[in-house]
């Protein structure tokens, strides 16, 4: 286990792969069909294989923001924390910036719409804590450190190790306040109804993230929330 780290004694690459691996058998074929049909209503045409690749990508890469230098500097090379109060606060912003600017969907006519959905999904994967409306367009959040969105160093290591897992070769970079401002400003001007479909991608992220984390940190115990998500995705929910 080496940097980048997802948590104490947990590598980020292991967490990325683990979050998707634990979904095996937990998402029904009907759920993928629901995503495909819902997208098609808004002119976003993706066959089932395309939908599955997109779900895999967003689950595997949902914690890209944790590759920020600020977070990684809290750990040694073996993911042992260098201080007791380490934190990944605001890491969802780095993940969102990566998907908004540098994620490249598989061949689809409305690629920008797809990127918007995945961006919202990763930005809201901590939606019990923060939602997009909590962020101000013209300033970083309180106690934000720009090193939190410097992703090139460790994010590139992550992407290199995930080649063959995600759908295509991708790049990541260090992001800036201008990137943050422009992304949030663009979303503040959007009112398209299709944007609500981000929830269809959010559910697999949250299930994979919570399941893998519980296996690593809590000896496999499941919360009631995780059980609800399992039921929704395996039952072909219409979230």
Curated annotation (Swiss-Prot):
Optimum pH is 3 and 7-8. Expressed as a fusion protein to increase stability. GO terms for molecular function: endonuclease activity; metal ion binding. Proteins of this family have an N-terminal nuclease domain and a C-terminal helicase/ATPase domain. In some CRISPR/Cas systems the domains are swapped, in others they are encoded separately. Residues 5-195 form the HD Cas3-type domain. Mg(2+) binds at residues 63, 92. Its EC number is 3.1.-.-. CDD domains: Cas3''_I. Keywords: Antiviral defense, Endonuclease, Hydrolase, Magnesium, Metal-binding, Nuclease. Optimum temperature is 50 degrees Celsius. Expressed as a fusion protein to increase stability. CRISPR (clustered regularly interspaced short palindromic repeat), is an adaptive immune system that provides protection against mobile genetic elements (viruses, transposable elements and conjugative plasmids). CRISPR clusters contain sequences complementary to antecedent mobile elements and target invading nucleic acids. CRISPR clusters are transcribed and processed into CRISPR RNA (crRNA). Cas3 plus Cascade participate in CRISPR interference, the third stage of CRISPR immunity. Acts as a dsDNA and dsRNA endonuclease (in a fusion with Alicyclus caldarius esterase to increase solubility). Its cofactor is Mg(2+). It comes from the Archaea. One of its GO terms (biological process) is defense response to virus. Belongs to the CRISPR-associated nuclease Cas3-HD family. This is CRISPR-associated endonuclease Cas3-HD.
